[in-house]
Structures are given as structure tokens and as C-alpha cells.
Design a protein with these regions (language model features):
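Conserved AdoMet/S-adenosylmethionine-binding subsite of the radical SAM
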Residues: 107-266, 274
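Ferredoxin-type iron-sulfur electron-transfer modules and their immediate structural context
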Residues: 1-61
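Cys/His/Pro-rich metal-binding microdomains
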Residues: 18-21, 35, 80-83, 87-90, ...
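Iron-sulfur (Fe-S) cluster-binding segments and ferredoxin-like electron-carrier domains
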Residues: 23-47, 91-100, 305-311, 331-337
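Auxiliary Fe-S-binding modules of radical SAM enzymes
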Residues: 1-28, 222-350
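Short, conserved glycine- and acidic-residue-centered signature motifs
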Residues: 70, 103, 194, 264, ...
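Conserved Radical SAM active-site core
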Residues: 39-172, 341-350
Length: 350
């Protein structure tokens, strides 16, 4: 347990948490929607500080980042619970956990693990990192001192105040839309009343100098509106620019939506086509290994510049300045090239 940041005192012993956009108003002795941010005698505390339910080494493309340190490996960590209520959550074993469980790993221990396993970064992932932001930022500060980068894998439902705290400590964030951000879908399947805070957070993240990428989980039949895709990608072009990476990912049955099918490839390709038509240069299709759109192509000449199969790199056709070797177009990639293009077994640390 640790004193939280990002909260206000309210009358009657209540506190308002301002880490995520739910802005829960919490009576003394109670917890917010996330079940880990708690009012303890009129002060907000993080009840699961440094208590991790998942610690694992992954390819960075699994997060998924396609334009940040491609080909590298990341130490991913997550805790209990979440600030959303997704009915399809693939990590529901930890995100729906209401008891605080896991292994205590203090910031210095986590950084030591990252160095031991020779990862270039630490990702706060598996559940929503905004709810354990105090721990993430404590780790991030120490990680920077050891030359490690810090990554948020987030639903983006964070406040501007939270982004302000992240500035200078979090290096990159991938924001995971679901169902094209269509509001009826979010209301019913995510327990989210408005997606506007996500858009505000994305703009604020970019303004703060944090590298931003996006994913969009396409759920067949209920979260695959092409009209909503058109709206979201037009907004992304206008607000974030043509070079923001966007990956459409395939749904698979999980948690309370086991009776829904996998997303047809044709549906993903239709979304891809709309995003490209709306001017986005770097659009991907994920969770469909072997498809041509998991690779990066030069917007100048169309040549393949980074080849991928699943989460692994197969080709690198950029020069030292990250320019396409065919036409010289500068490709917005942070980091790389990898030392070698090879498969490394995913290691379960805890």
C-alpha cells in the first residue's frame, strides 16, 4: 500500500480519484471502480503497490508496437483488476480479480530483472496501467537511470493530469481501441460511457512528446461498423497526423463472449482499406500471422521496409537514418535495427 497521487479531497471524508476518466468519488473505507485505489481515512492509497500478477518477456511487437524499438524484447508486467469492464477480456483472470494477489516486486527488483534478461524496455501491460500509475512511474524513473525505456499498453481512459505525471518518464504508449470506438459498443461491452476522454488523452500524449501508436479490436457483428471505422480514422488523421500507426486486430472468443466467432480476415481488410483511404500511412492487420499487412511498407514507393511474421521480424530494409533503401523516404521508426532477426522463446518470469 502506498499513498496515491492524482486525487482531490471532497467534503464528508470522500476523495476524488483523478487518475482515470471515471473520476471515482470514493467514501472512506471504500474502493473505486478498479478495486485497487482506496480511500483510507480521507486519503487515497494504491492498495496493490508493487504486487504483480504477471511478469513476462515478450517481443515488443506483441504489445503491439510496430514503430518503437522493432525487433526488441520487453519485460511486461501487470497487476490485479482494471478500470474497464470488457466482456471479452483475454486477461480476465487478472483484470477481473477483486482480491489483491501476486508477487511483491519492488521497483529496484523489477529493473534488475529487466537488466538480467537483457530487455531494452519495461511495459506496463496485461491490465490497465493507469490504475497502478504510482508504481509504474516509480519503476520508470529508476529504469531511465539504467538506460531502459518505459511503455504503457493502455485503454487510453486516463486524465490529462495523469498524462502530465507520465511526461518525461513514459516513453511510448499504445492505445487500444475496441470496436472502432463506437459508443453503443463501448457502453454495452466495455462499461464505458464516453470515448471522448480517450481522444483527449491521445492528443495530450502526443503533445507531451510520448510516442503514440493505436490498435483497434474488431469484434464481429457488434464492433465492426465500417461507418465507425471511417469516423475514427478520419479523426486520427486530423488529430494525430498521417503517420500514427494503427493496427486492426482480430477478435477471438474469450471470457463472457465465447459464442462469438473470430474476426473474418475480409472484415479486417475492409477496415484496413478505409484507414488507408483516409490518409493513414501505417496501417496494420494483427492477430492474423502470415498476412501481408503485418509488415511495414514505404508510403513513398510502396516497398516493404520491415517484414514481419506474427510478432517476429523477417526483413529490415531501412538505412541507418531509417530511410527506405529503395526511394529514400524517411520512415518514422524509433530504435533499431535489431542486432539480429531471430526467434527467441517467450520467457515466463513469474
Amino acid at each position: 500500500m502506498k499513498d496515491a497521487i492524482l486525487w482531490n479531497k471532497l467534503p464528508g471524508g470522500k476523495v476524488e480519484c483523478i487518475a482515470c476518466s471515471r473520476r471515482c468519488k470514493i467514501p472512506d473505507g471504500s474502493k473505486g471502480f478498479c478495486f485497487v485505489r482506496q480511500n483510507a481515512g480521507g486519503r487515497l492509497v494504491l492498495a496493490n503497490y508493487a504486487t504483480l500478477e504477471a511478469i513476462q518477456i515478450d517481443p515488443i511487437e506483441k504489445k503491439p508496437f510496430n514503430h518503437y524499438m522493432p525487433g526488441s524484447y520487453v519485460l511486461g508486467v501487470g497487476t490485479s483488476s482494471c478500470n474497464w469492464g470488457c466482456l471479452f477480456c483475454q486477461n480476465h483472470n487478472i483484470s477481473k480479480e477483486r482480491d489483491i494477489k501476486g508477487k511483491e516486486v519492488m521497483p529496484e527488483e523489477l529493473v534488475a530483472l529487466a537488466k538480467k534478461y537483457k530487455t531494452g524496455s519495461i511495459a506496463y501491460t496485461y491490465n490497465e496501467p493507469t490504475i497502478f500509475i504510482e508504481y509504474a512511474l516509480d519503476v520508470a524513473e529508476l529504469a531511465h537511470k539504467h538506460g531502459l525505456k518505459n511503455l504503457f499498453v493502455t485503454n487510453g481512459y486516463m486524465t490529462k493530469e495523469a498524462v502530465h505525471e507520465m511526461k518525461g518518464l513514459i516513453d511510448a504508449a499504445v492505445v487500444d481501441w475496441k470496436g472502432n470506438g463506437e459508443q453503443k459498443f463501448s457502453n454495452k461491452y466495455e462499461v464505458v460511457v464516453s470515448n471522448e476522454p480517450i481522444k483527449e488523452a491521445l492528443v495530450e500524449l502526443k503533445r507531451s512528446g510520448i510516442h503514440v501508436e493505436m490498435t483497434d479490436l474488431i469484434v464481429p457483428g457488434v464492433g465492426d461498423s465500417l461507418e465507425a471505422c471511417n469516423s475514427l480514422t478520419r479523426w486520427a488523421y486530423d488529430a494525430l497526423g498521417p503517420d500514427v500507426p494503427l493496427q486492426f486486430t482480430s477478435f477471438h472468443p474469450d471470457y463472457k463472449m465465447m459464442d462469438y466467432p473470430d474476426t473474418p480476415y475480409e472484415t479486417l481488410k475492409a477496415h484496413y482499406d478505409i484507414a488507408k483511404k483516409n490518409g493513414l500511412n501505417y496501417v496494420y492487420i494483427g492477430n492474423a500471422p502470415g498476412n501481408p499487412y503485418e509488415s511495414t511498407y514505404c508510403p513513398g514507393c510502396g516497398s516493404l521496409v520491415i517484414g514481419r511474421y506474427g510478432h517476429y521480424l523477417t526483413e529490415w530494409k531501412l538505412d541507418r537514418e531509417k530511410r527506405c533503401v529503395e526511394c529514400g523516404t524517411l520512415i518514422p521508426i524509433v530504435g533499431g535495427p535489431p542486432k539480429k532477426l531471430s526467434y527467441r522463446d517467450i520467457e515466463l518470469v513469474y
